[in-house]
From Swiss-Prot:
This is Phosphoribosylformylglycinamidine synthase. Keywords: ATP-binding, Cytoplasm, Glutamine amidotransferase, Ligase, Magnesium, Metal-binding, Nucleotide-binding, Purine biosynthesis. It comes from Photorhabdus laumondii subsp. laumondii (strain DSM 15139 / CIP 105565 / TT01) (Photorhabdus luminescens subsp. laumondii). The gene is purL. It comes from the Bacteria. Coiled coil: none annotated. The keyword Lipoprotein does not apply. Monomer. The active site is at 1135 (nucleophile), 1260, 1262.
Length: 1295
């Protein structure tokens, strides 16, 4: 084993934070230094050249400290016996660089601790602060890392002796293995194996427990019900299915696949030909698939991997729909207990305690959103929608006074995708079809996730809880998705017959489900499964929940094609069995020469005992809302700090919102980029205005008083949100229903039934809405002991509705951004029929009250009329702005609209004279619309036509300035500066950013929000945006070839190819594996573009591993050197491609002074819509654009320029090789965050070579080359955005 020192692992501010935590734990630690250490397992000695190559390969990140570290060593490494995602990717890079002697690379962090005298207990506390026990271990000597490369022998299976010991043996196994089997299931298994005449193996029992867990089988939703001694006619699931029976319109697949599918639009889908790699548009139906999952249990235990794998699993569900589909855009949601931010605690936040094994709500929200965002970012899926709610209180609900809150959190992950018409239905599995696992190797992780998540937190063993959390490797999932994409793009020749994702229960659930759904059985070989931990037992190999895996059936004759696709994409796969005629499962283990599984499928998936729920209805007593102590001004301030209301920038800018080049409406609205969008909208393709919309609705606190009203309100809110998109037909909207409940808690079961009935049997059929997909999580309770007393925290019944719809024209989406350009009017459309209830509202929550009467859907007919009226007004282009009434009520609706428009409001609420407080803070359904004053009569007549005449109230108008004033008649009710409200609203996000990210950056961003004179994003163009300078060359019908270059993990190549294609190029898909294998050479191309993403998951530095695989491979290095030297070529590097090409500067003439691109100053992935200025440089891509100031999409974690010395910066500047700089909204070059999202010196974000043929930039022009994909743009822009000029300039240069 070779040991090689690496770069510093923690920045100064991270060390300061760590020292501060040590102080809180009363540890006498004086200083900490941390650096990466690399361990190389080699099977032959390295030559001097190869040693130098390895040293160079592992030189990345900030410069290595010159001094020898001082202090006591604590070395944190991956758990021995595991192989980390970092290891597998770094090893891949080493092999691609020709270092075949390297068996494996691994990395640890060496912490050098300088401290006073510490006890063993204190060292253990410090150790626990430095590592994650699920994934890591701590050594005290570098040499101990040798254990990382130890090889363990496989552990044999166990048999449970029920034939001799009887039922008690099964009961003991149930506890020891954490199976969570019910008594009748134990009876079922006893009977089944006695009939088979043998003892079950531990593998069979574990597989049965996972496949039949509540998590996988949804027993409660399929149960029979007796409520108040009355047998109920339908199960919960049948009531949900009733929505489809009543309104099957536009639904193509429901209830029987990994995601539901509805009818989409006929558009041109853009992808590369399998024959020659040439990209083009393919006219076809792009149907819409939808899915929303939860990952609550793992997120409570370990938030980052819990949320990350939650998103990853949902993405796999989409990709594994039908015979293969394409995930497109995502959403996330979180419900947690109170944050209690240190030093920023709020008046309504009381500490009720929690069990040790789960993390705090604050830690969940510090880590969980980062995990979810990181997976989406690295996979390449924009995260465009979400919700965030906190609740934790002692309230008088259905079961009397008790603690209600989210110690067991909700972590929601969902999204949309597209699928071809011929692939919606899965194929048949033929006898003899090859059964394949696509994706990464097995590891001893995620065991028992299905069973563990089916229990209330606190019921299972703590070690089992930790074992049930998975690890993430999104770059691996991206590779698998590329394989799936290549397959579905083959149309009728798609080799995938059947596909499922591997989720809860691992292969033990996925493979039986695959063969059973295909009408077959299966014969498998355990040792064919890719395995990174050979010491695992058969149970662990078969049942672990290692992520990023799919199971597929492929016909034998199609196998060579499938294997070739996998090899090109470097996606691991294993053929582990074949389908059999007999519906039987046989798993052979050639190592031990036995059969861990040998059972009929009917025993595993047959008619296990059906659940019966015999429950009683309880009425919530509630209490009248005591308002004597509520001061209006104080109420506003409190509500602005409630997380459900407050600004959520800290949850949004961590997530890429522009990848795919098909995002039309993200969360950020207007020139000031305020996160208040009502819904998310994508284009159906890269050349269309058809699209898809998503919105969310949830009203969980209402359920503490009225279960059914809470469910109806969730549907209603999702509708009032999605109404801002142009959908036309209400029946086009399809819903996902995610139900979270503490089943078995007094009153909750009957309440769940009432809520499902209200939605499935009544409201949705009345509206013509269908719920073709959903999920349930029935164990939303946490138990623990505190000083000998048992305590419980029970979540409210929580229904999260996600609405999905086809969009007729994405350009018609209306946002909350107010306009003051003309005389205007603000109208409130009140669907609450003047009830103005306050039970379960934000106002009640911030005063620690509950109330007794809640908002509700007062009339399904009026709600439908509202949607139809808004659609008509959008079609007539009569709405200037739109925002629904939601958390915080009317006052928050108006405030958020004012924030988006950076303007004042003057509103008269005399309609609420009877109860002004209720009028301002009720959360009854409704919306505020801004219209031209001259259109008021017409708009009111349209609303009246749809039965809303009595619901419409004129409020006032938006006006320039900072005054936010509310009157009741002539009496001033409330006055505050809009800028002050904006800062209150932003303080939660500021405090969270300060804790989580670089506090200096958080402070700068908060300070920027205090600038009331900020003009917002603005545009200055020095060229004619409407001129197509490539048109004359396109008319020649000669398309020069551009190599659209990608490495494993790159995710922005399709939108890049589309931009070049539009400019008149023939875009060719070129994978690095094509160059390394010699399938393709660069000599045939005049233009090369290196695309964005996460090559090798950014291990060994962003883009550096990709670059070194070129620099250290002689044949490929020569190809690039020759290409860059040719005077007739152009080269562009964007984002990850920019980072990669900056490390190839020794090959690029005139690029010797280029910088490297390193970690952002915020130390966070930054997704922003940033303003840049095009500077005077030789860049051929930016010709005739000099002096322009244009917003552009930014999405990166490592974009800060780092020069080797000051002279290199000076040479770059003096030679005018800086091509783009970040500027603030005043047009000044800036290093301030967030106008400069990475902290680059002199605002540098693009550089070019001396002759201008090679340009690299961190922002993404390809994602915003169409106007419709800009988060904000001037009204006069038409089809093309200004960044399209880059690609047309390239075409012009080639003549």
């Amino acid at each position: 084993m070779k040991i090689l020192r690496g770069s510093p692992a923690l920045s100064a501010f991270r060390i300061t934070k760590l020292l501060s935590v040590c102080q809180e734990q009363q540890l006498p630690v004086n200083d900490i230094y941390a650096e990466y250490v690399h361990f190389a397992e080699i099977n032959a000695s390295l030559s001097d050249v190869d040693s130098a190559k390895l040293q160079q390969l592992l030189k990345y990140g900030p410069s290595l400290a010159e001094h020898e570290p001082q202090g006591t060593l604590l070395l944190v490494t991956p758990r021995p016996g595991t192989i980390s995602p970092w290891s597998s990717k770094a090893t891949d890079i080493a092999h691609n660089c020709g270092l075949s002697q390297v068996v494996r690379l691994e990395r640890g962090v060496a912490y050098y601790i300088q401290s006073g005298e510490m006890s063993d207990t204190q060292w253990q506390i410090l150790s626990s602060l430095l590592h994650d026990r699920m994934m890591e271990t701590v050594f005290t000597q570098l040499e101990q890392a040798e254990k990382l490369f130890s090889r363990q022998q496989p552990v044999p299976l166990k048999r449970i002796d029920i034939l001799q010991a009887g039922r008690s043996a099964l009961e003991t196994a149930n506890i020891e293995l954490g199976l969570a089997l019910a008594s009748d299931e134990i009876d079922y298994l006893m009977d089944a194996f006695q009939k088979l005449g043998r003892n079950p193996t531990d593998v069979e029992l574990y597989m049965f427990a996972q496949a039949n867990s509540e998590h996988c089988r949804h027993k409660i939703f399929n149960a029979d019900w007796i409520i108040d001694s009355q047998a109920q006619p339908k199960s919960l699931f049948k009531m949900i299915k009733n929505t489809y029976e009543q309104t099957p319109d536009y639904v193509l697949s429901a209830y029987k696949d990994n995601a539901a599918v509805m009818e989409g639009s006929a558009v041109g889908r853009f992808f590369a030909s399998a024959e020659n790699g040439s990209y083009d548009y393919h006219q076809e139906q792009a149907h819409i698939l939808m899915k929303v999952e939860t990952h609550n249990h793992p997120t409570a235990i370990s938030p980052w991997p819990g949320a990350s794998t939650g998103s990853g699993g949902e993405i796999r569900d989409e990709g594994a729909t039908g015979r293969g589909a394409k995930p497109k855009a995502g959403l996330v949601g979180f419900s947690v207990s109170n944050l209690r931010i240190p030093g920023f605690e709020q008046p309504w936040e009381e500490d009720f305690g929690k069990p040790e094994r789960i993390v705090s709500a604050l830690d969940i929200m510090m880590e969980g959103p980062l995990g979810g965002a990181a997976f989406n970012n690295e996979f390449g899926r924009p995260a465009l929608l979400g919700y965030f709610r906190t609740y934790e209180e002692k309230v008088n609900s259905h079961n009397g006074s008790e603690l209600r809150g989210y110690h067991k959190p909700i972590m929601l992950a969902g999204g949309i995708g597209n699928i071809r018409d011929e692939h919606v239905k899965k194929g048949e599995i033929s006898v003899g079809a090859k059964l394949i696992v696509l994706g990464g190797p097995s590891m001893n992780i995620g065991l028992g996730g299905g069973a563990a998540s089916s229990m209330a937190s606190g019921q299972s063993d703590a070690d089992l809880d930790f074992a049930s959390v998975q690890r993430d490797n999104p770059e691996m999932e991206r590779r698998c998705q590329e394989v799936i994409d290549r397959c579905w793009q083959l149309g009728e020749n798609n080799p995938i017959l059947f596909i499922h994702d591997v989720g809860a229960g691992g292969l033990s659930n996925a493979m039986p489900e695959l063969v059973s759904d295909g009408g077959r059985g299966g014969r498998f070989e355990l040792r064919k499964i890719l395995n990174d931990e050979p010491g695992m037992s058969p149970l662990e190999v078969w049942c672990n929940e290692s992520q990023e895996r799919y199971v597929l059936a492929v016909a034998p004759e199609q196998l060579p094609l499938f294997e070739e696709i996998c090899r090109r994409e470097r996606a691991p796969y294993a053929i582990i069995g074949e389908a059999t005629e007999e519906r039987h499962l046989l798993l052979n283990d050639e190592h031990f020469d036995n059969q861990p599984i040998d059972m009929p499928l009917d025993v595993l998936l047959g008619k296990t005992p059906k659940m019966l729920r015999d429950v009683t209805t309880l009425k919530a007593s509630g209490e009248s809302l005591e308002r004597r102590d509520i001061d209006l001004a104080e109420a506003v301030k409190r509500i602005m700090h409630l997380p459900a209301v407050a600004e959520k920038t800290f949850l949004i800018t961590i997530g890429d919102r522009s990848v795919t080049g098909m995002v039309s409406r993200d969360q950020m609205v207007g020139p000031w980029q305020i996160p208040v969008a009502d819904c998310a909208v994508t284009t159906a393709s890269l050349d269309s205005y058809y699209g898809e919309a998503m919105s969310m609705g949830e009203r969980a606190p209402v359920a503490l008083l009225d279960f059914a009203a809470s469910a109806r309100m969730a549907v209603g809110e999702a509708l009032t949100n999605i109404a801002s998109a142009y959908i036309q037909d209400l029946k086009r909207i399809k819903l996902s229903a995610n139900w979270m409940s503490a089943a078995g808690h007094p009153g909750e079961d009957a309440g769940l039934y009432a809520a499902v009935k209200a939605v499935g049997e009544e409201l949705c059929p009345a509206l013509g809405l269908t719920i073709p997909v959903g999920k349930d999580s029935m164990s939303m309770k946490t138990r623990w002991h505190d000083q000998g007393e048992e305590r419980e925290m029970t979540a409210p019944l929580s229904l999260v509705i996600t609405a999905f719809a086809r969009v007729e024209d994405v350009r018609r989406t209306v946002t909350p951004e107010l306009s003051t350009d003309e005389d205007n009017a603000l109208l409130l459309i009140d669907l609450g029929q003047g009830k103005n209830t306050l039970g379960g509202t934000a106002l009640a929550q911030v005063y620690r009250l509950l109330g007794n009467k809640t908002a509700d859907v007062r009339s399904a007919e009026q709600l439908a009329g509202f949607f139809n009226a808004i659609q008509q007004l959008i079609a007539e282009q009569k709405l200037l702005a739109y925002h629904d009434r939601s958390d915080g009520g009317l006052l928050v609706t108006l405030a958020e609209m004012a924030f988006a428009g950076h303007c004042g409001i003057e509103a008269d609420i005399s309609v609420f004279d009877e109860d002004i407080l209720a009028g301002l803070f009720t959360e009854e359904l409704g919306a505020v619309v801004q219209i031209r004053a001259s259109d008021r009569g017409f708009v009111e007549s349209i609303l009246a036509e749809h039965g809303l005449a009595d619901c419409v109230h004129y409020l006032g108008k938006a006006q320039a300035g900072d005054d936010f004033v509310i009157f009741s008649g002539n009496t001033e009710v409330y006055r505050q500066n809009r800028s002050t409200l904006r800062l209150w609203w932003a303080e939660t996000t500021w405090q969270m950013q300060r804790l989580r990210d670089n506090p200096a950056c958080a402070d700068q961003e908060h300070q920027a929000k205090q600038d009331n004179q900020d003009p917002g994003l603005n545009v200055k163009l020095t060229f004619d945006i409407s001129e197509d300078i490539a048109a004359p060359y396109i008319l020649q019908q000669v398309r020069p070839k551009v190599a659209v270059l990608r490495e494993q993990g790159v995710n922005s190549h399709v939108e890049m190819a589309a931009a070049f294609h539009r400019a008149g190029f023939e875009a060719i898909d070129v994978h690095m594996s094509d160059l390394l294998s010699g399938r393709i050479g660069l000599s045939q191309f005049q233009t090369l573009v290196a695309c964005g993403g996460f090559s090798y998951g950014d291990v060994l530095g962003a883009g550096e591993g990709w670059a070194k695989s070129i620099l250290f491979n002689e044949r490929v290095r020569d190809q690039f050197a020759v290409f860059f030297a040719r005077p007739d070529t152009l080269a562009l590097g964007v984002c990850n491609g920019c980072q990669m090409m900056s490390n190839l500067r020794e090959l690029i003439p005139g690029a010797e002074h280029w910088p490297r691109f390193v970690r952002n100053r915020s130390e966070r992935f930054e997704a922003r819509f940033s303003l840049v200025e095009i500077t005077d440089s030789p860049s051929l891509f930016l010709q005739d654009m000099v002096g322009s100031r244009i917003p552009i999409a930014v999405s990166h974690g490592e974009g800060q320029v780092e020069f080797r010395n000051r002279q290199h910066l000076e040479m770059l500047e003096s030679n005018q090789l800086v091509a783009l700089r970040y500027v603030n909204n005043y047009g000044q070059v800036t290093e301030n965050y967030p106008a400069n999202p990475n902290g680059s010196v002199n605002g540098i974000t693009a550089v070019t070579s001396l002759d201008g043929r090679a340009t690299v930039m961190m922002p993404h022009p390809e994602r915003v080359s169409r106007t419709v994909n800009n988060s904000w743009h001037p009204d006069e822009w038409r089809e093309d955005g200004p960044w399209m000029r880059i690609f047309r300039n390239a075409r012009k240069q080639l003549g």
